[in-house]
């Protein structure tokens, strides 16, 4: 999750790890290159850019949650209805 701490505190997806976008370069060592990495943000824009950065730095299994947590929450609400 590349959102800011206040955004993450307000709404989070279970199992997500908070690494704010601005801190990714210094925290690359915390991300496992051998597993799938799903990038998450509010709308999908920041996570897209962060995912591109990871790919440029040798990560191969990088995916973006299209539409971000906004779209994810809407999908969950529709499924629950």
Predicted regions: what they are:
Residues 5-38, 45-81:
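Rhodanese-like catalytic fold shared by cysteine-dependent sulfurtransferases
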